[in-house]
Amino acid sequence: MAGFFEDLIGCLDIVNPHYVEPYAGGAGAGIALLAEDVVERITINDIDPAVYSFWTAATKHTDEMMRLVYDVPLSIDEWRRQREIYKSADVSDVLALGFSFFYLNRTNRSGILNGGVIGGLAQAGKYKLNARFNRETLIGRLERIGNLSDRISVSSLDGRTVVGRYGDCSDVFMYIDPPYVVAGSKLYLNSFEVRDHEKLAETVNQVKCANWIVTYDQSELISELYDKHFQCELELTYSAQKPGKAVELLIASPAVRVAISA
């Protein structure tokens, strides 16, 4: 997504772009844009306490996070311990909770936090729980985040609050990627009910100045909620719920629609 967003931001000709993710999760695109100086700063928001704790730990306790990645055992006993920390959702220790999020994201099947461990509890599968836990690579990613931390803001607000807060800012490019309609309860700790999707659409439809993109799984409900805005299919090469190719729905603000068509 980062390359696609870079092209759009270039077409929009925004001065000192501010990239905002109200439902951040991994926020990989935002970090890539920041590292390449495509955007001046980024705001990462997620109401999920584990996601918030990860980004807080990664930006404010980078060295400690890197040390944990270097030292942590890769075993089923440790996986169980980290799962219990994650389930506790105790934000009084953002380092512990944030690291548990990171550990499970790297050791669970397809990175799904509530999913099972890669290779199964018996570790009898083709791939084991260490398959996606390359210590050197992960330490490098954390180091990059730490080096950019003075240009990263982290918050744990309701996503609609963030959309409303930045909706009148013409320098903002907002990537709104809320919980899915169909598989939301399987993929997110804070999944959405129908009314939540409706409330978000009401908020997005009131945005006046910010440039924005919304992405969802294909859903008649979402198509109807955003029927006054440009919509198209977006093909992704990987999706957490189904490795391989996946098609999502992309919805865009008027200015972004023009940029997509340019």
Report the location of each language-model feature.
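Short, solvent-exposed loop/turn segments at secondary-structure junctions
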Residues: 26-29, 48-50, 107-110, 159-162, ...
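Conserved S-adenosyl-L-methionine
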Residues: 4-5, 15-77
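A residue-level signal for conserved active-site and pocket-lining positions in enzyme catalytic cores
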Residues: 25, 55, 102, 212, ...
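Short glycine-enriched, charge-decorated loop/helix-capping segments at active-site entrances
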Residues: 187-191
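A short helix-to-beta-strand connector/capping loop
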Residues: 38-40, 147-152, 227
